[in-house]
């Protein structure tokens, strides 16, 4: 018995902090306008704020609006008690291995410059042994993957801190921002194997949750046992290699600098404190601003850098909120200060935009580093990177233009810059695009991300040929088509913040992508060019200045080759057979060939043969005998001919012959979508010139979910829209508003049933809707919510009281079976199942079982096993093989991948044994 191959792909996202991650695939055996517009926006307005709000909405408790660290720690404790990993699912990374994601920490080994470490905020710690040319992950996949800081002790030991304080856990108690909590400090004595320091393990049931964010960690220059750490629970110091810690300062500490001489500068609630002994501190900032003072500055961020050449040279950058306040320099160890830069029209590395669209990110992305060979030279990074020198002032040293070969390109949102301790001309910097390197003191840069699989995906689509299209935070939309030099290298095909993505199975060159805040696009050339396909009906709420959509707008594509209710048709006109023999040369007289017809069932009529070559003509009789200016024969059964011209022709030789199609002939026509074959059978004889029309069963529907709005003049704006024209690139599709969900209700996720008749829509406020009878809606009148003839029905079938319904799946074998996942800490159930989802009043039952109580973001049935459900969660993949039982048992299924949030799961569902090496089974390209 031949077995089909079932494959899964899961979108992985960052643990501990925000989302990071890579695409992965698992396998196991189972039973059977201007269209070409290239969008490259690196700095779309409001990206970071929307990103934060989107994540926080899915994770925070729906009542308090906060994330209780105690709930996070309790869920982690439950996770550790979950059934051990099984070998049912074996994950393989699908990269991308040629680009990187957000990275906050870097380290060059003090004894060997070839060894470099990079800490991503969601993909773990990576190590390079060739100066950054390639990378391998070294952090334990079961450990916390949110690396926020790293250092090397005098004896070579490596320490890294987890948690990204710039997104939350900035103090004690409840968290009102979206980050994924860290789990203290990890240490390695060999640079490869790391263990968690028990002394930094967050208390499992403590609301204060110290050590959930280690913003910075630095090692004493000579004492290998002395390490300092800036944490959400205070400024900490160990003198025994991390066995125990002493709190030097209370409160949330975010930034400090430790000089080559052991001098410390630390930001304590806006005051700059200095210590020369690592124990006692003196303030070097002042409450009163003078020309030589360093002001206190609360409510923003402060970073420091001390020259390794001269301990007296200290630099400090302060932000006013997220905007640049000023940059200061001291040449006397902090006794006096001078301002060397402040926010201005020509100097503003932390903000972007114009007028009302200006946004700043100085809290999120900020670094300050002094040159190791020139104490009068410093780099400042934020959205862009600048450098200052005592002789040249401020100069922008990077651009955001990612064109091939640009030596000044650095990805937006820079977080760190370090200097090789063994070569002051070698510099590494990290940003939301991974790791970049300079060999000439920052004059030019090149990307160093080979094998650094740390992209942060929100959504993705799987093509019929198993190519992947995915949307990433701050890295746009990437296309994995397996043509890269690296095994899993991607092409960046679209900019901004990417989100939901899809690839047509009818025409794999047709793709769909989006950017933040409801902007969506399509491509018909494999991602080379893109164009929006929205219209004024969809954008009415945006035009009215009302909330338009979720930060990542849900959309859904449905396609079929067997739509029995299709009202579209393919017209066919029978044409004669024709063959060109090319041009004569005035010498050759004999020509042989065969006429091929587009319809193999066509019968040729010998008596209609005509042969022309300029003024020369010949015909054939019913027996196929050719006469006139040429002689020869035409064989009616095969359409083969041999002719000899009396005079060698010099014009083009054309042979034509009429045909007919007998009744019950099999035809192959071309669909309007992708010119795919449409099979038909004639009902009577067809002669040349006759027309034949057949139903076109190859159809598609495309759905988008926008925020529903109501005003006095327009009571139904926004909502759920569909089009049947998404494959027609000659025009803007006709959109139909098929559902209005109530004022200010925002869709979060969508899933259509396999038969295309039901669309399930979840919202950010806990509701689940079923939109049915889609197959019967073939016109605007039948589909529109405002039409008296509408056949579509909209039914609310679930309500989870303000929680975000994060994911939906419909059993591909039974549309009555619908599973949903829910977010929001502080609840007791995160997975629900309905077995009567098409009923007038469906019911949903909790399928929490022994699944840890953390937010879940995606669900998927197994097409080959109705008792199996996959769940993508805060900490990876879980599976229940008894989902139909009252209390399912879950196993952790993270074999081959880290414990990272999984925001989308796609099963490669087909009964067709696809063979990529067989052109017959390959989709038409």
Residue ranges of predicted features:
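Beta-propeller blade termini and top-face loops
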Residues: 24, 28-576, 663-925
């Amino acid at each position: 018995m031949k077995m089909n191959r079932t494959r899964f792909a899961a979108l992985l996202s960052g643990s501990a902090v925000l989302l990071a991650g890579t695409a992965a695939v698992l396998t196991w055996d189972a039973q059977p306008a201007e269209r070409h517009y290239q969008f490259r926006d690196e700095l779309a307005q409001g990206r970071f704020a929307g990103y934060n709000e989107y994540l926080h909405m899915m994770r925070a408790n729906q009542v308090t609006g906060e994330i209780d660290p105690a709930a996070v720690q309790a869920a982690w404790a439950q996770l550790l008690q979950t059934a051990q990993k099984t070998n049912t699912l074996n994950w393989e990374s699908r990269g991308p291995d040629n680009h990187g994601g957000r990275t906050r920490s870097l380290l060059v080994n003090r004894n060997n410059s070839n060894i470099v470490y990079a800490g991503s905020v969601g993909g773990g710690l990576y190590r390079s042994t060739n100066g950054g040319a390639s990378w391998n992950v070294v952090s334990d996949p079961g450990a916390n993957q949110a690396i926020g800081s790293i250092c090397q002790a005098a004896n070579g030991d490596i320490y890294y801190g987890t948690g990204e304080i710039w997104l939350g856990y900035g103090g004690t108690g409840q968290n009102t921002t979206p980050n994924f909590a860290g789990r203290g400090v990890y240490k390695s004595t060999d640079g490869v194997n790391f263990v968690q320091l028990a002394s930094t393990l967050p208390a499992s049931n403590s609301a204060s949750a110290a050590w959930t964010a280690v913003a910075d960690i630095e090692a004493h220059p000579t004492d290998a046992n002395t390490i300092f750490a800036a944490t959400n629970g205070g400024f900490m110091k160990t003198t025994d290699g991390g066995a125990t810690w002493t709190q030097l300062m209370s409160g949330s500490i975010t930034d400090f600098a430790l000089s080559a001489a052991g001098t410390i500068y630390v930001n304590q609630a806006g005051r700059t404190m200095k210590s020369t002994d690592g124990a006692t501190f003196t303030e070097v900032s002042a409450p009163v601003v003078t020309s030589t003072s360093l002001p206190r500055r609360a409510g923003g961020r402060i970073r420091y850098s001390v020259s390794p050449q001269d301990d007296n040279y200290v630099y400090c950058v302060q932000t006013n909120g997220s905007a640049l306040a000023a940059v200061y320099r001291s040449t006397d160890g902090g006794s006096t200060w001078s301002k060397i830069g402040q926010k201005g029209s020509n100097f503003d590395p932390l903000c972007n935009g114009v007028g009302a669209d200006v946004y700043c990110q100085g809290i999120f992305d900020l670094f300050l580093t002094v040159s190791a060979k020139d104490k009068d030279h410093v780099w400042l990074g934020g959205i862009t990177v600048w450098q200052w020198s005592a002789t040249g002032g401020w100069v922008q040293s990077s651009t955001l233009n990612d064109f091939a070969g640009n030596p000044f390109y650095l990805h937006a949102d820079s977080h760190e810059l370090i200097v090789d301790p063994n070569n002051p001309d070698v510099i590494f910097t990290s940003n939301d695009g991974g790791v970049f390197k300079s060999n000439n003191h920052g004059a030019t840069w090149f990307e160093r991300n080979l094998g650094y699989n740390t992209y942060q995906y929100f959504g993705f689509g799987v093509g019929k040929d198993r190519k992947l299209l995915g949307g990433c935070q701050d890295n746009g939309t990437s296309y994995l088509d397996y043509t890269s030099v690296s095994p899993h290298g991607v092409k960046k095909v679209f900019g901004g913040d990417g989100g939901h993505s899809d690839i047509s199975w009818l025409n794999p060159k047709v793709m769909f992508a989006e950017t933040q805040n409801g902007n969506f696009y399509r491509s018909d050339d494999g991602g080379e060019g893109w164009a929006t396909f929205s219209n004024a009906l969809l954008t009415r709420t945006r035009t009215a200045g009302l909330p338009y959509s979720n930060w990542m707008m849900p959309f859904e594509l449905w396609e079929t080759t067997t739509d029995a209710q299709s009202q579209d048709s393919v017209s066919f006109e029978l044409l004669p057979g024709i063959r060109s023999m090319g041009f004569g040369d005035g010498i050759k007289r004999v020509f042989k060939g065969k006429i091929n017809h587009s319809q193999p069932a066509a019968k040729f009529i010998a008596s209609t043969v005509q042969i022309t070559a300029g003024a020369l003509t010949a015909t054939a009789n019913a027996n196929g005998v050719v006469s006139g200016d040429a002689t020869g024969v035409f064989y009616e059964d095969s359409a083969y001919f041999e002719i000899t011209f009396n005079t060698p022709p010099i014009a083009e030789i054309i042979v034509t012959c009429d045909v007919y199609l007998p009744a019950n002939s099999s035809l192959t026509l071309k669909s309007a979508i992708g010119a795919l074959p449409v099979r038909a059978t004639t009902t009577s004889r067809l002669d040349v010139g006759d027309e034949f029309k057949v139903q076109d069963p190859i159809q598609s529907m495309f759905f988008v979910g926008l925020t529903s709005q109501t005003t006095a003049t327009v009571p139904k704006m926004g909502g759920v829209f569909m089009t049947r024209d998404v494959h027609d690139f000659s025009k803007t599709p006709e959109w139909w508003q098929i559902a209005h969900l109530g004022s200010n209700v925002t869709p979060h996720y969508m899933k259509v049933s396999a038969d295309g008749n039901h669309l399930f829509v979840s919202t950010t406020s806990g509701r689940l809707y079923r939109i049915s009878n889609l197959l019967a809606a073939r016109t605007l009148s039948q589909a529109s919510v405002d039409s008296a003839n509408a056949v579509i029905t909209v039914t609310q079938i679930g309500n989870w009281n303000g929680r975000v319904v994060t994911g939906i799946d419909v059993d591909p074998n039974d549309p009555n079976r619908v599973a949903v996942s829910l977010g929001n800490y502080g609840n007791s159930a995160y997975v629900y199942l309905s077995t009567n989802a098409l009923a007038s009043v469906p019911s949903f039952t909790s399928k929490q079982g022994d699944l840890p109580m953390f937010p879940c973001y995606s669900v998927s049935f197994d097409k080959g096993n109705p008792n199996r459900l996959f769940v993508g969660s805060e900490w990876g993949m879980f599976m229940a093989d008894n989902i139909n039982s009252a209390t399912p048992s879950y196993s952790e299924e993270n074999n081959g991948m880290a414990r990272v949030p999984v925001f989308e799961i796609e099963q490669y569902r087909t009964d067709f044994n696809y063979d990529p090496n067989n052109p017959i089974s390959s989709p038409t390209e």
